[in-house]
Design a protein with these regions (language model features):
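Solvent-exposed loop and capping/linker segments of extracellular ligand-binding repeat ectodomains
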Residues: 1-311
């Protein structure tokens, strides 16, 4: 039977470990029973509508094992893990809708409003039982302690088309060029790495197999990027949207060939600079240096690449 298995690292000052499993108006019969084990201390619980199952532990400092077992699948977007959760060490159960019991197409492993911000490690086979997932919207958003992920993390997700905000405001310091290799249906990467303040560079082949990808709005906005690989978009779909893709970063030069053959429909604020200069209403002086071929390749696109239209 598949269980959710995590490691919880407790310090000297944060010894209260709390697990919450909220419920809405309806709970699917297949998800109304849960067994929780903390370092071998096991308890069984019957979940009630409009209430939360709350479990508290007071362990000694160190690393502890937490197991959550719903008897098969687990409810998506529901559990609130202990804030001291540092690792997920086995594949997660299939994600099902908590109210209907049906397969969930959205990859929300925990309650999106309460992510485990101290999480540092994900097992590479995390999604082995969730090949049905379509949308990875905000799945790992806000995980500020997560500095890297396995390059094969998304390999099982052959139907995934949306990666909106998947790592937004996370602590990623680098990403593998293989990260999205298996996601041949991917179309939307908007805000995928937005606000990643420790992400200084990206591989040229990051989207090399994503030939259907066409939405890159704010994908790297407000990240720490200082340069862009010229071949980053060489294989993506034509007529895509690039609104604020690299806005408010430290990029100083737009490489030749970046937008060749992409025929974008919108580049509004694509390279809007983080800083403003006096008497520079279109941010031309503060913006990065563009090669002439950028303007040739985007001449039919809507918007100004150095300044986002405000309405």
């Amino acid at each position: 039977m598949t269980k959710f298995v995590a490691e919880v690292t407790v310090g000297k000052r944060d010894r209260l470990v709390t697990l919450r499993i909220p419920a809405g108006n309806t709970i699917a019969p297949s998800l109304n029973q849960v067994t929780v084990s903390f370092d071998g201390q096991t308890s069984q619980h019957h979940r009630e509508p409009i209430s939360s199952t709350v479990l508290e532990y007071h362990p000694m400092p160190g690393t502890h094992r937490l197991e959550i077992d719903f008897g098969g699948p687990m409810p998506a977007a529901t559990i609130i893990l202990p804030e001291q959760t540092t690792a997920i060490i086995s594949p997660i159960p299939a994600l099902h809708d908590d109210a209907t019991g049906m397969l969930s197409t959205a990859g929300h492993i925990w309650n999106p409003a309460k992510p485990p911000r101290q999480l540092t490690q994900l097992v590479s086979s995390l999604f082995a039982h969730n090949t049905h997932l379509v949308a990875l919207s905000g799945t790992f958003a806000g995980l500020t302690a997560l500095t890297e992920v396995p390059e094969s993390l998304f390999f099982p997700l052959i139907y995934a088309s949306t990666f909106t905000g998947v790592f937004a405001v996370s602590g990623l310091t680098h990403v593998s060029r293989q990260l999205f290799t298996a996601n041949l249906q991917a179309e939307d990467f908007s805000e995928a790495f937005m606000g990643c303040k420790s992400l200084h560079s990206i591989p040229a082949g990051l989207f090399s197999t994503n030939t259907h990808a066409r939405i890159f709005d704010r994908t790297f906005a407000e990240s720490a990027l200082g340069e862009v690989p010229a071949a980053l978009f060489s294989n993506v779909a034509k007529r895509g949207s690039f609104v604020e893709t690299f806005a408010r970063t430290q990029i100083k030069h737009v490489p030749e060939g970046l937008m060749t053959d992409t025929e974008p429909v919108n580049i509004d604020g694509m390279f809007e600079p983080a800083e403003r200069l006096p008497h520079d209403p279109m941010n031309i002086k503060a913006a990065p240096v563009f090669s002439q071929d950028f303007f040739d390749a985007t001449r039919l696109a809507t918007g100004v690449p150095t300044k986002r239209a405000r309405f």
